[in-house]
């Protein structure tokens, strides 16, 4: 897939893959290809989540620094 999908779209695709694989009515090669696609999607989703987690951590840390500096001014 060359187009950039949203996080939610990739989650939906991963759910489709899981549901299809759980049915168990595919040939081995088809199952393998779907499994491979699912692993690739999972890696991209994990990377996106890690990036967002890092941004959240930065925002929290920046906010704590601001709060701490404001407390110092009050003293």
UniProtKB/Swiss-Prot annotation:
Gene3D superfamilies: Exonuclease VII, small subunit (1.10.287.1040). One of its GO terms (biological process) is DNA catabolic process. It is found in: Cytoplasm. InterPro entries: Exonuc_VII_S, Exonuc_VII_ssu_sf. It catalyses: Exonucleolytic cleavage in either 5'- to 3'- or 3'- to 5'-direction to yield nucleoside 5'-phosphates. Heterooligomer composed of large and small subunits. This is Exodeoxyribonuclease 7 small subunit. It comes from Thermoanaerobacter pseudethanolicus (strain ATCC 33223 / 39E) (Clostridium thermohydrosulfuricum). The lineage of its organism: Bacteria, Bacillati, Bacillota, Clostridia, Thermoanaerobacterales. The gene is xseB.
């Amino acid at each position: 897939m060359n187009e950039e999908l949203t996080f939610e779209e990739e989650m939906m695709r991963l759910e489709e893959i899981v549901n299809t694989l759980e049915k168990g009515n595919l040939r081995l090669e088809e199952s393998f290809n779907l499994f491979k696609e699912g692993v690739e999607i999972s890696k991209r989703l994990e990377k996106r989540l890690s990036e967002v987690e890092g941004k959240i951590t930065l925002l929290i840390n920046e906010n704590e620094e601001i709060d701490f500096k404001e407390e110092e001014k009050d003293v």
